[in-house]
C-alpha cells in the first residue's frame, strides 16, 4: 500500500471507541476544561478530525458505522423507539426495521470471516432480540447493553422487579446469554466496559489480529458518576453555561480549530430559563448537573487510557488503528427520557436532592443551554440535522499512516470508517452477496489517500444527506440545505455556506436560488437511493418533534 506499513507481516488491529452524546468541545483537544489526558494523548499522537459528521442520534449513527452505508438502508431509518410509537407511518417499511438489518454486511462479520478476532463491550442499540444480538452480527466475544441507555450503576429500581411493568428484554448480554443486572457487582458503566474489553483481548489467540469495538454509554443520561470524581468539579460551573460557552469558543480559537472571526449560532433555550433568570437554588442545581457530566467525561477518558495502556503493554498499540468519536451532538433535550422510554421516568424511585445528584439513585440530565455550550459554534444539538447535532469530535491514532498532532478539516462521515478499515486490513468488501444473502455496497469512502497524499475523500460530484425525526438536510461541497417542519409555520428549504458560516446563521436561499434548487434535486436523488419515508410536515411538526427548538430558530 502507499503508506509506510510496519515491518511485521501481521495485519493491523482496530479499536473503535464511541462516546455517547459527547459534545463537540467536551474533551481537551477540542477546547474543554475537563481533564481528559488520555484523549489528549491520542490527539497529540494522531489527527483531530474537525469536519467529521454522524447522524443526529445514536442508533442511526451506529448502524452507519458498522455498515458503511446510510441508516435508512441499514435498518435505522428512524430510531426503533420512534417507529414503535408511530408504526402507522414507518412500521414495516424497508430500512425501518429498528435493528441492523440483513441488507448490510456488518464490519465485524466481514472481518471475522477474514480471520480477525472480533470483540465488543458496551452499548449495542442495534437490536433487542436474540437473533439480533452482537454475537449474531460477527462478534466472537461481546458484553452488551442492548437498548439505548441505562443506569450507569446498573440500578433498576422497581421497574424490572415489578411484575406489573410490561415485559422488557434483558438489558445486558454476554455473547448469546442474558445477564441479570443484579449480578453485576461494583458496576459502573465506563469502568466495566473497559475492563471487559481488556479481558476479552487477553483471551484471544495472541497471533490473531483483532477488531475491538468499545461503545461507552457515557456521558448519556442519566448523568451519574462516583462521588469522588464529581467533587473534583465542585464550583467549576457556578458561572453558568454562557460563560462556559464563551471560554470553550476561545479555547477552540487558541487551538486553531475555528477561525478567530467565527460567529457562533445563538443559544436556543427551548423554553428554559436563562442563567440570570434562575434562583440561587436553581443555579446550584443546574451547575451540579454539569459537574456530574464533567465527572462522567473524565471517567470515560480514564478508561480509554486503561485500554490504550494495555495495548502498549502487550506491544500492540502502534499496530492498532485507534479511532475515538462521538455518536452525535450533545444531548440538549429537556425531556429526553420521555420520547425514548415512551413513559415518564419513575421519579418516585429516585432521589434528586442536590447532595445526591449523580448518585446511583438519581435521574438527571443537564438541558439545552449546557449542551449548546458544548456544540458551539455550531447550531443546536442532538436530534437536529443542523451542525450541532451531526458535527462531532473524532481523533485517529495510527503511526504507520498518520503523522502526530495534526488537524484535518476534510469533510468526512461515519460511513467512511468501514471502507477505511477494510482497506487497511486488505480485506475486500464482499460486494452484493455475503453469507448467502443480498447486501448493499457501502456509500462511505476510505480515508487512506487523503492522509497519505492529501487527496479529497469525496469527489466534487459527491453529496451527503441526512434525515431523522422528519428533519432533512443535503450537502454538496460547502453548501448545505436544511428542511425542518415547524408547527404553525410554512416550511421552506434553507441554504447555508458552511465554509463561511459555521453557525448556520445566514440563510442564502434567496441569494443563491440556483444552488438551492440543485441541492433539492440532490435531495430527491438521496431520498430515492436510500428509501427515506417522509411523513407529512404537519404530522412531523406536531407529533415527531422529539426535539423542538423555539419557532424563530429554525
UniProtKB/Swiss-Prot annotation:
GO terms for molecular function: arylsulfatase activity; metal ion binding. Binds 1 Ca(2+) ion per subunit. Keywords: Calcium, Cytoplasm, Hydrolase, Metal-binding, Nucleus. GO terms for cellular component: cytosol; nucleus. Belongs to the sulfatase family. Its cofactor is Ca(2+). Ca(2+) binds at residues 327-328. Its EC number is 3.1.6.-. Coiled coil: none annotated. This is Uncharacterized sulfatase PB10D8.02c. Its main location: cytoplasm. CDD domains: PAS_like. The keyword Hydrolase applies. It holds the Pfam family Sulfatase. The keyword Hydrolase applies. It is found in: Cytoplasm; Nucleus.
